[in-house]
Amino acid sequence: MPEMEINIMKVLIFTTRQLCYNSGYYFAHRIGEEIEKLGIECEYCEIPENAIPSAGIQIAQPAIENAGKSVDEEAEKMLESYIGKEYLAILDFNSKLPRLILDDESYYLDSIDAPFYNFILDHPLYHHSTLDCKLKNYYAFSIDENHCKYIQNFYPHIKAVYQVALGAENVISLENLQEKKKSILIMGTYRNPDIYMKQILSLIHI
């Protein structure tokens, strides 16, 4: 086994998805800037969007059925470079990393000595295949209190779930709300919730 490389005051920040409007890179570096203000160095690893396959279907399914997906050769080399290293923490957003499994059938993230923090930016059901992975040192962030409770209830192997308040600009005055000429809601992303209802109902009975 290779000698452990220690980066105890360094945080490793992955981006395995670009998210809506290519915001993954932005989130990673803004969070990294705040961490570095605390005197902690950050290391970034941006994996190309399609280098790690997604689960492949809309309906959530057991993680074991998704773990063996093949990874792009170049991305595989990037990921292998972190095996055996130690970090203060590993971060990613709607991460694909928990599904990755090594040749010895252990989880890839367990080969790096660091707690893994997965920022879940959607309803957790969308990420069942990664949240269900039984990592040794798994934590999650969510943007909604009920989402946190959902993760705690259905994924008890995740050690802790933290709610992160949404950032916002200064409060916009609503005094002239009635003067609005148009009432249009622009949805950045949309998935038909009926697709997931069957899965939600099945989880209720677990």
Regions from the language model: what does each represent?
Residues M1-I8:
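Short, Lys/Arg-enriched N-terminal segments with co-localized hydrophobic residues
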Residues I204-I206:
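Conserved small/polar residues in nucleotide/adenosyl-binding loops
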Residues M9-N22, S183-D194:
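Short hydrophobic beta-strand segments
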